[in-house]
Regions:
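Acidic, polar-rich low-complexity tracts and alpha-helical solenoid repeat scaffolds
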Residues: 1-178
Length: 178
């Protein structure tokens, strides 16, 4: 993977006006995008959004450069679709971190991380859970006004939220016996 990444970057630098340089940008994004997926993830059923989002950010940036520089490229529609996926994955990562803080009793850190996810990733599906983390965190901190504000926003945007009924049911990996 590293050598392919270096080759694509070298091609972009050396031949920026080549008629097919858009493919090099696309390839650079794919290399980082596929870095998130491995056989271990598949076998362990690990959620890729629980991993460090560095590769996701790099993939997003590469796809963004492709879309901005070559809006008419044949690779642009796929790059846009992958960018949407990556935004959702990065938002979900922030929510995972917020939940981690909440479980450890760091309620202020949990609320701040959830708030960061909401500000940075406005359209992501993970925002419903981020709002729920904020509601629980502010409640645990005794900040009733902030809790009520977050709950009002959540009810307005997600009136039928699964979090009102205990949250989504998660299927545990085969190796998690307890």
């Amino acid at each position: 993977m590293n050598s392919a990444k270096k080759i694509s970057e070298r091609l972009i630098k050396k031949y920026p006006n080549h008629p097919n340089v858009d493919y090099a940008y696309y390839l650079r994004g794919l290399i980082n995008f596929n870095d998130r997926v491995s056989a271990f993830n598949f076998l362990s059923r690990q959620d890729a959004t629980e991993r460090d989002p560095k590769a996701a950010r790099e993939a997003f940036d590469a796809f963004k450069q492709l879309v901005e520089r070559f809006p008419d490229s044949t690779y642009t529609p796929d790059a846009i679709a992958r960018m949407k996926y990556l935004v959702n994955a990065m938002a979900q990562y922030e929510v995972h971190v917020a939940n981690y803080y909440y479980k450890r009793g760091a309620y202020l850190a949990a609320a701040n991380r959830a708030q960061y996810a909401i500000k940075e990733y406005r359209e992501a599906p993970a925002l419903e859970e981020a709002l729920f983390v904020m509601v629980r965190s502010y409640d645990a901190l005794g900040m009733t006004e902030l809790r009520d504000d977050a709950e009002r926003v959540m009810k307005a945007n997600y009136p039928n939220s699964v979090y009102y009924r205990g949250g989504p049911v998660k299927d545990n990996p085969w190796w998690k016996l307890w």
